[in-house]
């Protein structure tokens, strides 16, 4: 029996193009992406968690959706269905492409030397790249749905589609990534 995500999408054919993110993006086949916190005991076990569940967890981060995992999983499933209808591609592949395009490769850190503080450009670890990408995608979807006729699922689908195409004009996550990398480049 073949296990598909939500009984609809095959994650076996999903390819991660970025070699640095390969070991951190888990697209292991699961029926329902809900581990009930099994991967929260050790530091880097979140890299074993399915990326769809990590996206749902990030959507639960704001005040209104805290603890409503079933509701956020329904939002993610609806968004993936919208993506499949619009792009005619595997929506899990679109999610992976969006994560690759919206994670910053370098950012700045504050260094104090002799009482003078300045910014120094540093490379970003793959784990932090993914965390930042998830955060910005979820934030972009919830901000665009605020005071809008569109549902959160429609806004999440838009954000993922635009981020997978690396559209800086329409994607909040890609815009934030470019902004961080531009600041880091000026701090070299």
Curated annotation (Swiss-Prot):
Belongs to the universal ribosomal protein uS7 family. Keywords: Ribonucleoprotein, Ribosomal protein, RNA-binding, rRNA-binding. NCBIfam families: PRK04027.1 (NF003106), uS7_euk_arch (TIGR01028). Part of the 30S ribosomal subunit. This is Small ribosomal subunit protein uS7. Gene3D superfamilies: Ribosomal protein S7 domain (1.10.455.10). GO terms for biological process: translation.
């Amino acid at each position: 029996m073949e296990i598909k995500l939500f009984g609809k999408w095959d994650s076996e054919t999903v390819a991660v193009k970025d070699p640095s993110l390969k070991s951190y993006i888990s697209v292991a086949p699961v029926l329902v992406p809900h581990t009930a916190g099994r991967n929260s005991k050790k530091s880097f076990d979140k890299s074993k968690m399915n990326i769809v569940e990590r996206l749902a967890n990030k959507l639960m981060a704001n005040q209104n959706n805290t603890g409503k995992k079933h509701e956020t999983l329904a939002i993610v499933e609806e968004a993936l269905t919208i993506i499949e209808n619009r792009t005619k591609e595997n929506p899990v592949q679109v999610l992976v492409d969006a994560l690759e395009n919206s994670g910053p490769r370098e950012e700045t850190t504050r260094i104090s030397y002799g009482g003078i503080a300045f910014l120094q450009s540093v490379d970003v670890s793959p784990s932090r790249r993914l965390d930042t990408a998830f955060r910005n995608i979820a934030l972009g979807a919830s901000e665009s749905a605020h005071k809008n006729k569109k549902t959160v699922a429609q806004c999440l689908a838009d954000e993922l589609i635009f981020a997978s195409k690396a559209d800086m004009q329409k994607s909040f996550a890609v815009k934030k990534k470019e902004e961080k990398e531009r600041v880091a480049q000026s701090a070299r």
